[in-house]
Every structure is written in C-alpha cells, then in structure tokens.
C-alpha cells in the first residue's frame, strides 16, 4: 500500500483536466467515506487502547502523604515552571527577574518581524529564526535542569 497516491501525468485525460484548472480534488481516493468512516475510528480506538493499556500496566503511584510539620528544604513548582522559577531564583534583584519574565514573550512576539523578508518556509533556509529557536530551546532546557538542582549547583549544573 502506498502512502501517497501520485497522479499519472502521462495520461492525456489527466493532463487535460489539469490544464482546465482541475486540481487535487478531482483525482485520487475520496475522503468520504474511506477516511472518515474506516481509518479515523481505527486510529481513535488504537489511541484509546494504548492509553488504557499504559494506565493498566504502569499506573501512576501516589506520592508521600503531606505532613504539615515537616516541610521540605526547598519547594519546587511543577516541572513546566522550572525555567522561569530558575530565573527568579538566580537573579539577585527580584524586579529584574520579573522584567526578564516579560522579555520572554516580547522576544517571541518579535521573531516573526525579524525575518519577515524571508519567503522560505524551510527552517534550514531561515537562519535567524532557527538561531533564535535553538538558543531559546537550549536556554530553556538549561534553566529547567538547573532548577531541579540545589541553588549552589544550579548555574553550573554540578559539572564544575
């Protein structure tokens, strides 16, 4: 079974249709009823079966019960807040930490305007956007790993 069904461009009937402007909607396999009635339910049921199977085979364990008289030394936020928590924890001036928090979304809003002259959609042909994306990804991972470590090892990640 082929994943992509390519049109036969050597067929004179197909070339005549394409010359009239009849595009991809006039050849190939129709979405109704083939995809919507047969393929989508199989994918949905397979996804549900995988989720239920993983939940049954490896259930999530509950953590220790809360003890109000024994608080941990350092309370960490949820994992997705680790990078911003690390910024607030490392920056000495808290106002500067809040300002850095506002610079992140402002910087993300500027990215489309930086490279608006580039007509390519291929990420490898958009060097500015790729550089900003890779720098942001590496910085976020670095800050996230550092937030999980104690404060004295958080900047060097315990390597130095």
From Swiss-Prot:
GO CC, any one term: plasma membrane-derived thylakoid membrane
Family, per the entry? Belongs to the cytochrome b family. PetD subfamily.
Task: Provide the species name.
Answer: Parasynechococcus marenigrum (strain WH8102)
Q: What is this protein called?
A: Cytochrome b6-f complex subunit 4
| Keywords on record | Electron transport, Membrane, Photosynthesis, Thylakoid, Transmembrane, Transmembrane helix, Transport
Recorded GO MF terms = electron transporter, transferring electrons within cytochrome b6/f complex of photosystem II activity; electron transporter, transferring electrons within the cyclic electron transport pathway of photosynthesis activity; ubiquinol-cytochrome-c reductase activity
Q: Transmembrane: present as a keyword of the record?
A: yes
Show the InterPro entries listed in the entry: Cyt_b/b6_C (IPR005798), Cyt_b/b6_C_sf (IPR036150), Cyt_b6/f_cplx_suIV (IPR005870), Cytochrome_b_C_euk/bac (IPR048260)
